[in-house]
Amino acid sequence: MYTKADAAYIPFAWMNPELAVILPVYAGDHPDYLREALESIVRQSLQNFILVVVEDGPLPEAITQVLNEYKDEMQLLQHSQNQGLATALNTALDWCEQYKISFLARMDADDRMRPERLEMQLDFLNLHEEVDVVGCALEEMDTQGRPRGKQVFYPENHHECLRFFRFRDPLPHPGVMFRMRFFQKAGRYDPGLRYNQDTELWYRGFLNGAVFANLPAVLLEFRMTEAFFATRRAGKARARQLLALRKEINKGLGFGPEARLFARGMFLLALLPAGIRKLAYRIFR
C-alpha cells in the first residue's frame, strides 16, 4: 500500500475518468522505449482516462527526464525502493480503487498501443457486461520498433480461453483491460511471486468465476529483445516455480494429462540455452 509520502498527487477530479491505464516503471527500463510507450498512450483515440505511473524504486536520470516530459499527463505514484512488478501493480490498483476507477488497462514500458486500443476494449466491455477482462491480438516488433512479420492472436471467448490455458496464458498481460471487479473476484497480484505473476492471476480468475475474452484486433505492438529471450522462463529457479504453478493450475482446473506433459516440457525448455528457447518460441508462439 502506498502512502501520501510515497505518491505525487495531481488534481484530476474535473476529469471524472472511469478508466485508468497502469504503467509500472523501474530502473531497468529503456528511456527511448518508455517515451514511445507514453506517446502511444497520450495519442489514444479515447481521451477520457487517467494514466497512473508507478515508479518502482529510484530511477536513472534518463528515465526521470522522459517522465518529466509527460508529467502533466499522468498521476505519479512512487516507491522509495524497488519492490517488484506485483507490488507496483497492486499500488496502482489500490489507488484506482480509492478513486472508484471502474476499468483498468495494463501497459508495459517497452511496448506501444495502437491508437484505437482503449476505445475498442472499453466499447467491448460496455457491450458485454458479463466479461471481466478482455485482451487483444499483438504484433511483434524489434528493438528499433519495426514489425517482425508476426502477429499473435488469442482465443476470443471464455470457453476457448480456458482450453487454451492448459498450455499457455490466454491473454497478453500488457494488452488487457480489466473491470475492477476482476480483482474483487480473483484478488490482487501475488507479491510473493518473483515470476509468472500474470499466469497465477489468470488461474485465480478462472478459479473464482471471472469471465475472459479477447478481441481479434491487433491493438498492441510488443517489443522483442534479446533480453526477452535470455530471461523468459529461464533458469532453474524460474523453471521450478513455473512447474509448481502449472501443477497447481492443472489440479485446480481439472486439466488432463496433456497439460501435465506440457508443463514438464516447459520446465525442461527453461533449462536449455537461450538460442534453443528462442527457436522454440518462434515455432510455438
Q: Where in this protein do the model-derived segments appear?
A:
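Nucleotide-sugar donor-binding/catalytic module of glycosyltransferases
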Residues: 2-234
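Non-catalytic, C-terminal membrane-associated alpha-helical segments of glycosyltransferases
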Residues: 230-285
